[in-house]
């Protein structure tokens, strides 16, 4: 994995065929045979380009321009600010709270099996946790990642939120915090609240723990991919992190491992949507349908270590299946908090987090 400068350079916008796209706040419309897809940068960009974008271009004879700017919340803010015409045709990595807002504000297209025939194969859970203004193409869950060189395996979320009893002063300055624009931060705060009897309806225990944890935090970032250099250079030893990137880093010989602590975890549905003002809606729907094709699901999820968006794929390697949501039984054990509640409270939680961390 590259150092910080290389990671940043890879996060520049990729023109998957020819040329390059500058990424202002709103991207100018392109030709009808060009599709603009928004998604994450760093290793995610490398993987989706290889496993999904390049095969899609070959199959449909089109060009895909990849825009790697912004988190899910930030990209929905672009959709809102542009009244549904942000310059990208596919919002490739939203989450259920953004889909709920998109439905309420009428800024995301409703997607049915007519537009995306592969919808018939998705998990039933996907239909329950997200409105039809998007499609769940993959899943992750909140994991606790630790540096195996310096720390024993954490047993509880308390080992992160109150690290002194388990690890002593040696871990001070080696924790990372994520800003609430990243749903990773929100989920970790919910687990903090649960440690003290709270939850989404009572987050005060989380704020108390965050205030006490603050002196132990060495770095704070927004995007998940921005954390990679800190894991690699031995600066961060303990972090809440998405299972997919955790598995990717383990597979690429970072000195880390990840676990689901004894209190359990929260699942994340990774969703794709089409803004109402998208310039190339037909091709956008084709791209979302293509992401759900079995071969594409297999290639992408194996490479990124995320869980599939459909339960009918069964030929997973044993080591992959052991840490992924691949059966209805495993899906039933994952908690998905009320996304409508999260969406309504997220602004308040963000302001509280900023107040404590400033």
Could you describe each region identified by the protein language model?
Residues 2-21:
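N-terminal secretory signal peptides and thylakoid transit peptides that target proteins
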Residues 32-100:
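Early extracytoplasmic/lumenal segment of secretory-pathway proteins
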Residues 42-49, 72, 87-88, 93-218, ...:
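Extracytoplasmic ligand-binding site segments that recognize negatively charged/polar headgroups
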Residues 97-101, 232, 237-255:
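A ligand-binding cleft/hinge motif common to bilobed small-molecule-binding domains
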Residues 139-140, 208-213, 221, 250-276:
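Periplasmic-binding protein-like
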Residues 143-150, 191-196, 268-281, 288, ...:
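A bilobed periplasmic-binding-protein/Venus flytrap-type ligand-binding module shared by bacterial periplasmic
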Residues 275-334:
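Mature extracytoplasmic/periplasmic domains
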Residues 317-358:
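Extracellular/periplasmic bilobal clamshell ligand-binding domains
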